[in-house]
Swiss-Prot record:
Gene: trmD
UniProt keyword Cytoplasm present: yes
Gene Ontology biological process: tRNA N1-guanine methylation
EC code(s) of this entry: 2.1.1.228
Organism ancestry: Bacteria, Bacillati, Actinomycetota, Actinomycetes, Mycobacteriales
Name assigned to this protein: tRNA (guanine-N(1)-)-methyltransferase
Length: 292
């Protein structure tokens, strides 16, 4: 996969070189280019914004800068070659991981889009965009080329978004119902959520197959050694060795956490009779944890 990020703060994207994303770069599963938008500014001050038509506070990012930048990055031509190509922040130890040792091959998730597949995907983080979901992350993990446009101030001139549809599949996307200073933080969030689902990035594919939202529910609590810590003990069922009971307990904990934190996720969800009985018990307030 190829990621390109256009921003006025290239240094903000340095975290893309670290941890698993850095390792993915090292393994040639991922390449990342970071482009300074000001390279496409033509005035002496390298300005990228101007006052809004109709008045109002703040500044709007100029189409005369964004248009050429997106044109060049789409085809990696012109000034796009001046962008920084990120290397892994450190050399990682190359040792066999879980899936390699177990002979597990993960083919990846199905792509959501087939039409216009020859066009790169342009993601524009904005509070006015559609909510970013785990389903999006799965679908976009199949993309060959994703370009991020990081807005600032009052955002990017809307004509840039409309014009970009000639060259890109454009998606305006939001990571939550709040406002950030710029799009860079959202890019880090989306990039990490997407890249970790590329086959070979995680050492154990079950790590993301058991994630929150992978089956529509939130993931339940996790525990490790020691069994007792500061007067708190690990639930007995997890040390019982009874895998069927452990699996059922984890399922119920996932249902419980979803009911307590995001009950709307249960609306319309297809549950088996055991799940239905447990959720009904939660609604009535008479379901206790099964720790035995």
């Amino acid at each position: 996969m190829r990621l390109d990020v256009i921003t006025i703060f290239p240094e903000y994207l340095d975290p893309l070189r670290h941890a698993l994303l850095g390792k993915a770069i090292e393994k040639d599963l991922l390449s990342v280019g970071v482009h300074d938008l000001r390279l496409w500014a033509e005035d002496a001050h390298k300005s990228v914004d101007d006052s809004p038509f109709g008045g109002g506070p703040g500044m709007v990012m100029k189409p005369t800068v964004w248009g050429p930048a997106l044109d060049d990055v789409a085809t990696m031509s012109g000034k796009a070659h001046m962008g920084a190509q990120l290397d892994s922040a450190r050399v990682h130890v190359d040792k066999p991981r879980h899936d390699e040792l177990e002979g597990i091959q993960f083919a990846g998730y199905d792509a959501a889009e087939v039409a216009e597949a020859d066009k790169p995907l342009l993601l524009v983080p904005t509070p006015a965009g559609a909510p970013f979901t785990q389903e999006d992350a799965r679908a976009w993990s199949n993309e060959e080329h994703i370009v991020f446009a990081c807005g600032r101030y009052e955002g990017i001139d809307q004509r840039v978004i409309e014009d970009a549809k000639k060259t890109y599949r454009v998606r305006e996307v939001s990571i939550g119902d709040y406002v950030l200073i710029g799009g860079e933080v959202a890019v880090l969030v989306i990039a990490e959520a997407v890249v970790r689902l590329i086959p070979g990035v995680l050492g154990n594919t079950q790590s993301h197959q058991d994630d929150s939202f992978s089956d529509g529910l939130l993931e339940g609590p996790s525990y490790t050694k020691p069994r007792e810590w500061r007067g708190l003990e690990v639930p007995e069922v997890l040390t019982s060795g009874n895998h069927a009971k452990i699996e059922r307990w984890r399922r119920e904990q996932s249902l419980k956490r979803t009911w307590e934190v995001r009950p709307e996720l249960l609306d319309g969800m297809e549950l088996d009779r055991h799940d239905q009985a447990y959720v009904e018990g939660l609604r009535r307030g008479n379901t206790s944890d099964n720790l035995n």
